[in-house]
């Protein structure tokens, strides 16, 4: 077992019998790497350096198999690869697993991952490792903070020491948490937010770690918006449609009796995009008519039957769950065989250049014989699949318009009846479905009639005789209107001259003769008037002192003895006002820090107090946890009130009245909370006394 090519100075520390990729072998833990040697071989089939191991997961103690899953960083591809080993010793499999877990954690300086993952076979799940070593070093961006085993974040006094092992930032904040829903990214956001916000960090240390008045979850519950708006949150750009087609889902594992498939949300989304009939069937049947797991079983079975339709053992087409939702694909072929009655009479049917936008499929244009639907019936589904995917990649707005126009109106009524059904169906999550090998011969056959979807304006040749007279008259009337709109040209029509009302004036002299001759100036008078205007304009001088306001001298008034006496009286008040302005400036000092810290602490306590407070007779009665939390916060509010009251008295004794007044609003808010708590206590005591009185009587 120990015979394999070892490097210089390499020493084997642990070894165990394991399976990797369904092959039996031996796993070695050396001083330099992790080596797996397949049975019957002398050379290592797999070797992993300890420094490249980033995460490890183990199966739960209740699991039937002892599994070890390692996440290894590939230095070439710069991506994480996963390796799963199954310990197969008859008696010591679990102990071997624990030994490897502890050794890897101690050597690679790993922390316990936060999210459990599934094993490769899909039947056993793995959970985070329990015994891991703490972090020896800290990231430069996260100096002074560490994640405790209970999920809280505290200052680390040893963080200033040099790091023994240099690790990436994303691997430092994994810890063994009591909150399984807390992900690594959420921990990183919280730590970085506390590191960047000094006031929030002080509040967190005081309320959560030191006084333990508020729990970790309650503290972050009211700060979800800060985490969402935090700069650490990755701004993920929406990924477009990939250009490659999704291949058929491959089985994750196979056994003699069953084949296991794994449908991830990404795979399901791709299936819905590439196969609209599957999405329609899902919305119409899941979860009211059929379970999600059975739905994907039928989907896998339908793929088998679709592949084997030409064989003798294939079930009828109507047996497929998705057959009735594929009528829109079949209508593409049927529409070419329809005889159209309600057609545009202005369409040039002789146009065969292919560039006339008014000519559409079905208007009598001769088709290429190579595109005959009868000859391409087997190839058309594949061609439509490629064309539809190309349109999706390019973001075409008129995607498959011709395919959906015939079923749009018919599906409108169906959507109304199944609106409630579709609203209750939720997006699927990662699902594992099983398709047994015996289901091929035991599939139930159900006959469904494919209804022909008709457009009101399209009629088959058989339906031409069933058209009523009213429908034909309506069609002809529409044709007449359409023709009139195109044959009548407004520019060629005679203009209708409008008759205007004539202006009748009885005395035209009043409007057209002007002034009398006596008021008309002569030429000499006109020239004199122009000369006077020109002389005044050239000789004009501005007189600005007369325009401006002339102020009177007030020096004599200010020097009166009454004013001097008045200033002497108000001189102390003026000095006090000047001092108060300087006092309110609040430069950086211990008082300002103390004031802001007291304000934030009281604000946090009051927010949680009023969130957990209750009034007898109003709303649902509080739970025991809410009552305990309210009592704990009330005690903290009373202590905070006494501290601030002492600070205020001390400032008053130092003649800092204005500074002491800044604490008054805080004390008033705390006093209201204390009064509310006392009233609750009195009401509760009074109610209990009444109950005891009635019981005694």
From Swiss-Prot:
Residue ranges occupied by any BSD domain in the UniProt entry: 174-231, 255-307
A Pfam cross-reference name: PH_TFIIH
Ranges annotated as biased composition (Low complexity): 115-136, 423-452
GO cellular component: nucleotide-excision repair factor 3 complex; transcription factor TFIIH core complex; transcription factor TFIIH holo complex
InterPro entries per record: BSD_dom (IPR005607), BSD_dom_sf (IPR035925), PH-like_dom_sf (IPR011993), Tfb1/GTF2H1 (IPR027079), TFIIH_BTF_p62_N (IPR013876)
Similarity field: Belongs to the TFB1 family.
Subunit structure: Component of the 7-subunit TFIIH core complex composed of XPB/repB, XPD/repD, gtf2h1, gtf2h2, gtf2h3, gtf2h4 and gtf2h5, which is active in NER. The core complex associates with the 3-subunit CDK-activating kinase (CAK) module composed of cycH/cyclin H, cdk7 and mnat1 to form the 10-subunit holoenzyme (holo-TFIIH) active in transcription.
Name of this chain's protein: General transcription factor IIH subunit 1
């Amino acid at each position: 077992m120990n015979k394999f090519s070892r490097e210089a100075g390499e020493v084997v520390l642990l070894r165990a019998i394991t399976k990797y990729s369904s092959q039996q072998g031996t796993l070695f833990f050396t001083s330099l790497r992790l080596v797996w040697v397949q049975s019957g071989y002398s050379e290592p089939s797999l070797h992993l350096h300890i420094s490249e191991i980033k995460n490890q997961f183990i199966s739960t103690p209740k699991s039937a198999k002892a599994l070890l899953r390692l996440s290894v960083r590939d230095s070439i591809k710069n991506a994480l690869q996963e390796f799963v080993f199954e310990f197969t010793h008859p008696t010591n499999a679990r102990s071997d697993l624990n030994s490897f877990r502890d050794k890897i954690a101690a050597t690679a300086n790993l922390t316990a991952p936060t999210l459990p993952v599934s094993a490769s076979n899909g039947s056993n799940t793995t959970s985070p490792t329990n015994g891991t070593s703490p972090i020896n070093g800290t990231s430069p961006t996260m100096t002074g903070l560490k994640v405790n085993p209970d999920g809280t974040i505290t200052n680390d006094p040893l963080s200033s020491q040099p790091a023994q092992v240099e690790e990436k930032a994303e691997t430092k904040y994994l810890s063994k948490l009591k909150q399984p829903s807390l992900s690594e990214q959420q921990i990183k956001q919280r730590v970085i937010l506390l590191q960047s916000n000094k006031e929030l960090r002080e509040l967190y240390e005081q309320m959560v770690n030191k006084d333990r008045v508020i729990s970790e979850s309650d503290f972050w519950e009211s700060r979800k918006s800060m985490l969402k708006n935090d700069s650490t949150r990755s701004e993920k750009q929406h990924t477009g449609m990939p250009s490659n087609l999704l291949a058929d889902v491959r089985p994750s594992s196979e056994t003699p009796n069953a084949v296991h498939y794994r449908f991830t949300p990404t795979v399901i989304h791709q299936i819905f995009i590439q196969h609209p009939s599957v999405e329609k069937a899902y919305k119409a049947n899941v979860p009211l008519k059929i379970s999600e797991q059975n739905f994907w079983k039928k989907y896998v079975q339908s793929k088998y039957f679709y592949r084997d339709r030409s064989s003798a053992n294939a079930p009828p087409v109507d047996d497929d769950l998705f057959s009735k939702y594929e009528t829109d694909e079949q209508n593409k072929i049927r529409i070419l065989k329809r005889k159209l009655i309600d057609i545009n009479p202005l369409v040039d049917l002789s146009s065969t250049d292919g560039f006339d936008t008014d000519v559409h499929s079905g208007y009598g244009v001769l088709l290429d014989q190579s595109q005959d639907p009868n000859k391409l019936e087997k190839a058309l589904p594949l061609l439509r699949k490629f064309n539809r995917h190309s349109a999706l990649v390019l973001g075409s707005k008129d995607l498959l318009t011709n395919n959906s126009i015939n079923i749009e109106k018919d599906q409108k009524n169906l959507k109304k009846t199944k609106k409630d059904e579709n609203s209750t169906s939720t997006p699927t999550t990662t699902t594992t479905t099983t398709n047994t090998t015996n289901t091929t011969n035991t599939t139930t056959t159900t006959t469904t009639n494919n209804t022909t979807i008709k457009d009101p304006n399209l009629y088959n040749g058989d339906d031409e005789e069933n058209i009523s007279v009213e429908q034909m008259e309506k069609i002809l009337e529409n044709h007449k209107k359409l023709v009139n709109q195109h044959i009548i040209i407004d520019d060629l029509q005679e203009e209708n001259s409008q008759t205007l009302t004539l202006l009748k004036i009885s005395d035209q002299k009043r409007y057209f003769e002007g002034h009398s001759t006596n008021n008309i100036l002569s030429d000499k008078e006109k020239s004199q008037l122009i000369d006077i205007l020109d002389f005044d304009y050239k000789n004009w001088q501005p007189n600005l002192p007369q325009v401006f306001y002339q102020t009177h001298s007030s020096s004599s008034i200010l020097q009166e003895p009454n004013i001097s006496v008045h200033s002497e009286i108000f001189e102390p008040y003026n000095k006090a006002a000047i001092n108060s302005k300087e006092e309110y400036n609040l430069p950086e000092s211990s008082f300002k820090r103390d004031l802001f810290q007291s304000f934030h602490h009281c604000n946090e306590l009051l927010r949680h107090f009023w969130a957990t407070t209750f009034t007898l007779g109003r709303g649902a009665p509080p739970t025991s946890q809410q009552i305990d939390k309210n009592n704990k916060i009330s005690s903290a509010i009373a202590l905070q009130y006494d501290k601030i009251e002492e600070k205020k008295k001390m400032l008053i004794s130092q003649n800092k009245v204005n500074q002491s007044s800044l604490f008054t609003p805080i004390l008033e808010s705390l006093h209201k909370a204390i009064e509310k708590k006392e009233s609750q206590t009195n009401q509760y005591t009074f109610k209990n006394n009444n109950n005891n009185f009635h019981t005694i009587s």
